[in-house]
Amino acid sequence: MNNPVIVDCIRTPMGRSKGGVFKNKRAEDLSAHLMKGLLDRNPAVDPASIDDIYWGCVQQTLEQGFNVARNAALLAGIPHSVPAVTVNRLCGSSMQALHDAARAIMTGAGDTYLIGGVEHMGHVPMTHGNDFHPGLATSIAQAAGSMGLTAEYLATLHGISREQQDEFAYRSHQRAQAATVEGRFRREILAMEGHAADGSLILVEDDEVIRPETTVEGLSKLRPVFNPASGTVTAGTSSALSDGASAMLVMSEAKAKELGLPIRARIKAMAVAGCDPSIMGYGPVPASKKALAQAGITIDDLGVVELNEAFAAQSLPVMKDLGLMDVVDEKVNLNGGAIALGHPLGCSGSRISTSLIHLMEDKNVRYGLATMCIGLGQGIATVFERVQD
């Protein structure tokens, strides 16, 4: 069986969804920029040799509709002979795109794939056009369709306090800001043009979403947004709304070596799992356990972990039940997470995987885990193994 490997991985800066730097850029622009960027950075790869493009996106309508993957590929100037498909597993879409490419390589269907994902939440809101079947009320709780209420329920079940959530959100912003100031994001961000508040053209090199002025005291004053009467989840402890894309060049190990390309990491194991939709944020626990078992390693073998921070109220129970609470500051979301950077739905799976691989290199560790929850009760996880000299 062929080994799927990561040759390169990049992302755009994360822009604020409300009047942010990408307000005049479309989802296809963000995606095409990264597709072109990966090929420019790896000239040994003949664009015509790409077997397929898998691109995650959740709200596949308006500018993100009609197979945004193909639209972006055409915009990027990729040969017309190269196919492209848009993948949707809600929040896990671009990680699913990675899994699809990895399996294609493992089965010998191809050697070279571009994968990634995008979401322009400023142009296509998360709830745009949503229309749940009324019959779902007979099999799941009515509130299961509200991600914020599922986070509230998870916090209640696991005894997660408002104070713990505020502390975790503060940590996310502080770590993301430190990573920005110290240049730790520079290797994973591919700068691109955007627009300042006055409409002038600028080069966007850093994430716009991080709020370095965040304090625990300030967070403590915010009102609960999903359950105003007795809730604990606030806008400040939820993932920020942002616009962004991420991308990876995935190849068979044999093809990468043949072309003399660097092998950044091997895909060691992949898993998805379901859980009660009422606690959708718990999905990373069964998915991660499944992936670790497939990899033949334990949670203690992991050097770094990237957990998508949908909500602090969701992240804390996951870390608790995965046995990570005692090593959070040594292993988990070391450069902050989605509370600070945002969670552009279709982008996040390959975004956290990209951040993870760069951290694995920085920390010189062998194994890393990227995992995330998925709306309506799913989780997805990938174990990466760094190729060490």
Curated annotation (Swiss-Prot):
UniProt main location, coarse: cytoplasm
Lipid metabolism recorded as keyword: yes
Subcellular location as annotated: Cytoplasm
Gene3D superfamilies: 3.40.47.10
Enzyme Commission number(s) from the entry: 2.3.1.16
Keywords for the protein's UniProt record, in alphabetical order: Acyltransferase, Cytoplasm, Fatty acid metabolism, Lipid degradation, Lipid metabolism, Transferase
One Gene Ontology biological process: fatty acid beta-oxidation
InterPro entries documented for this protein: FadA, Thiolase, Thiolase-like, Thiolase-like_sf_Thiolase, Thiolase_acyl_enz_int_AS, Thiolase_AS, Thiolase_C, Thiolase_CS
Catalytic activity: an acyl-CoA + acetyl-CoA = a 3-oxoacyl-CoA + CoA
Pathway given in the UniProt record: Lipid metabolism; fatty acid beta-oxidation
Catalytic site: 91 (acyl-thioester intermediate), 343 (proton acceptor), 373 (proton acceptor)
Superkingdom of the organism of origin: Bacteria
A single cellular component GO annotation: cytoplasm
SUPFAM superfamilies: Thiolase-like
Single GO molecular function: acetyl-CoA C-acyltransferase activity
Family: Belongs to the thiolase-like superfamily. Thiolase family.
Subunit composition and interactions: Heterotetramer of two alpha chains (FadB) and two beta chains (FadA).
Functional note: Catalyzes the final step of fatty acid oxidation in which acetyl-CoA is released and the CoA ester of a fatty acid two carbons shorter is formed.
Protein name per its UniProtKB record: 3-ketoacyl-CoA thiolase
Naturally occurring in which organism (per UniProt): Pseudoalteromonas translucida (strain TAC 125)
